[in-house]
UniProtKB/Swiss-Prot annotation:
Annotated positions of the Pyrrolidone carboxylic acid modification: Q21
Protein name in UniProt: Outer membrane protein 41
Locations listed in the record: Cell outer membrane
PROSITE patterns according to UniProt: OMPA_1, OMPA_2
Membrane topology: Multi-pass membrane protein
Free-text function comment from the UniProt entry: May have porin activity and function in peptidoglycan binding.
Family label: Belongs to the outer membrane OOP (TC 1.B.6) superfamily.
Amino acid sequence: MKVKYLMLTLVGAIALNASAQENTVPATGQLPAKNVAFARNKAGSNWFVTLQGGVAAQFLNDNNNKDLMDRLGAIGSLSVGKYHSPFFATRLQINGGQAHTFLGKNGEQEINTNFGAAHFDFMFDVVNYFAPYRENRFFHLIPWVGVGYQHKFIGSEWSKDNVESLTANVGVMMAFRLGKRVDFVIEAQAAHSNLNLSRAYNAKKTPVFEDPAGRYYNGFQGMATAGLNFRLGAVGFNAIEPMDYALINDLNGQINRLRSEVEELSKRPVSCPECPEVTPVTKTENILTEKAVLFRFDSHVVDKDQLINLYDVAQFVKETNEPITVVGYADPTGNTQYNEKLSERRAKAVVDVLTGKYGVPSELISVEWKGDSTQPFSKKAWNRVVIVRSK
C-alpha cells in the first residue's frame, strides 16, 4: 500500500511541475521590429523636414557621350514627411535645378535645360525592419519609390519651351544620427520623366526636346544630394506588450513553491500528540490587502478584467464600513506634468467605478495621485496602476 501511495505521489508531482513551467518568451526589445506591434502614434508625432543640395545629370542617348563630371548641374530639394511606424514613412519632396542635355558624338552641343519637380514617396527603413527597434540608432538605410510631376524648360523662362510630364521615381537614403532631432543624410535617386502630358512647340512647329534623328533625350535623370533631416513633434514609438511575461513567470514560480510546500506537508505523520486546550482570544481587525488595478499605456479607462478587484474592495467597505485610500500612478514615459494628470484621471476613474457601479459611499474614500514621482514596482509597465488599500 505504501509503495502504491509513493508511486502516485511521484506521478502527480511530475505532472504538476510540467504544467507550471515558466514562459521564456523574449521581450519585445529583443525582437526585430517587424515582429513587434507598436502603439499608433498621434497625428503630430514623428514628422520630419529634410533640406538637401547636390547635383543632377541627364543619362541615355547622346548624353552618355559627354563626360559625367561635365554633365553635372546644381540642384536643391525640400522634403516633408511622417513616419507611420518605425520602418514605414511617406513624404512629399520638391526639387529643382539644372539638368543640361547634350547632343553629338562627343556631346559637344549643350542645351541649357532646367527643371522643377514634386513627387510623393513611400519609404522603407531596412535597418529598423530587420533589427530590434531603438529610437537612438545611429545609422538607417531607407530605399523608396514614388510618383510625381516634372516641369522641364529651356533657359530661364519657366513658361517657354517647356514640357509637362509625369515621373516615376526611385532612390535610397542613408541617415546618420547627429542628435535626438537632427540627422545627416545622403541620398541618390533617379527619375524617369518621359511620360509627357503636354509640350511646347518651337517656330518650326517641332516639339521642344525632340529632334528628327531621335538623339535628343531628356527623360532619364540621376541625382545625388546631401543635407540635414529635422524631426518634429514627439519622436519614437512605443511597443505594445500583449501580456506581461514577467508577471506570468512570477505567478508560476509561486505555484511551484506552494506545491513543494504541500508535498512537504504530506510527508508529516497523520496523527499528532495531544495538546492542551487553549481558550482562544479573538481580536478582529479589518484590514484590506492592497488591490492593484492595472491600466493600458496612456489610458485611464478601467478594463473589464480589472473589475473583480474593485468588486472585492466594494464588498470589504460595505461589510466593515472601513475607509480606504485610492492612489494613482503613472510610468515615467512622457513628461512629468502629463503623468501627474494621467495618474489623477486613473485614480478618479477607479473612484467612479466604486461609487457609481458598486455603491461605495464616497465619504469612505480618500483619493491621491503621485504621477511618476513614485514607482511602486520595479517593472515599468506595472506602474500604470491604481493601488487601493485601507486608510
